[in-house]
Regions:
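N-terminal secretory signal peptides that target proteins for export/translocation
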Residues: 1-4
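Bacterial N-terminal signal peptides
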Residues: 7-20
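Extracellular/lumen-exposed scaffold segments
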Residues: 24-280
Length: 280
């Protein structure tokens, strides 16, 4: 009778506990899924105390995929985690993109092997269900559907063999501007945006601009330089009631393996002191 009473009490306590999803088996990576001309898989790990998942993508030579702002041509990646249980995924963290000139305006994206990282929030256990679409492009752009499930707990993420891969993707994000690489000034002369980019050991630089919904921007070109700075011009136009001067724009600046993301206010070019850069 005493044993029965203990069993009944234990059962009552169990029923009173909040429902917690318990994974049957920890799974911190999925199998590689081949879908010509790319393959992909999901991985997960804990990095510096934060849980992350990542979509790893490998593209065949000559193929590309896209950044969150794909540019004049391309498809913006889309991801959905609403079918997940016990875990919530944050907005994707993108590596710094490259610009590819396809002859029709160009696009911003990646080639080879890379991926997209998602910060995770969960208590003890989680089942992460990812569905999405990424564009892959060569001569034509093709939407490629991706889907995979991971099941894990905190101990599994802490012991995951994918910590290094996710850390590498996190480090590939655009960094904060610093003396090593920074937009020194941004101005508009009525025809073009003028950017002065400075830094250390600069051989060349490239710029990607994130325009507003009423902006039309051309391709940047280097028009001047000195020992530690480049002057770039970007043909620009915006609606009269959305002037560029006084507004903040976002730029990605790349110098080799280094990349920064910087928000900077556009000033009236006629009011700025002229930079002593040699025009090309």
């Amino acid at each position: 009778m005493f044993a029965l009473r203990i069993m009944m009490t234990s059962a009552a306590l169990w029923l009173a506990l909040p429902a917690v999803f318990v994974p049957a088996q920890a799974l911190v990576d999925g199998p590689w899924i081949d879908m010509e001309p790319a393959r992909y898989r999901m991985i997960a790990a804990e990095v510096d105390g934060q849980a992350y998942a990542a979509l790893e993508v490998e593209l065949k030579p000559g193929w590309h995929t896209y950044w969150r702002y794909p540019g004049a041509s391309g498809l913006e990646p889309e991801f959905d985690f609403t079918e997940s249980r016990g875990v919530a995924a944050g907005k994707p963290l993108f590596p710094a993109p490259y610009f590819f000139d396809d002859g029709v305006g160009g696009f911003n994206g990646y080639e080879g092997r890379g991926g997209f990282v998602f910060p995770l929030r969960f208590e003890l256990n989680g089942e992460l269900n990812m569905r999405g679409m990424i564009g892959v492009c060569r001569e034509v752009c093709v939407p490629m559907e991706v889907a995979q499930k991971l099941v894990f707990n905190r101990d599994g993420l802490a012991a995951s063999p994918h910590r290094g891969a996710i850390k590498t993707l996190l480090q590939a994000q655009p960094q904060e501007p610093s003396d090593d690489l920074v937009i020194r000034s941004a101005s508009f002369d009525g025809v073009s945006l003028q950017l002065v980019v400075s830094g250390t050991a600069l051989e060349t630089v490239s710029v990607i601009t994130i325009p507003g919904p009423h902006d039309i921007l051309g391709l940047p070109r280097i028009v001047g330089r000195d020992e530690d700075a480049f002057l770039l011009e970007i043909p620009a136009w915006s609606k009269l009631d959305h002037p560029l001067i006084g507004r903040k724009l976002t730029f990605i600046v790349r110098a080799g393996a280094r990349a920064i993301e910087q928000n900077i206010q556009v000033r009236d070019h006629s009011l700025l002191p002229q930079e002593p850069l040699t025009r090309q």
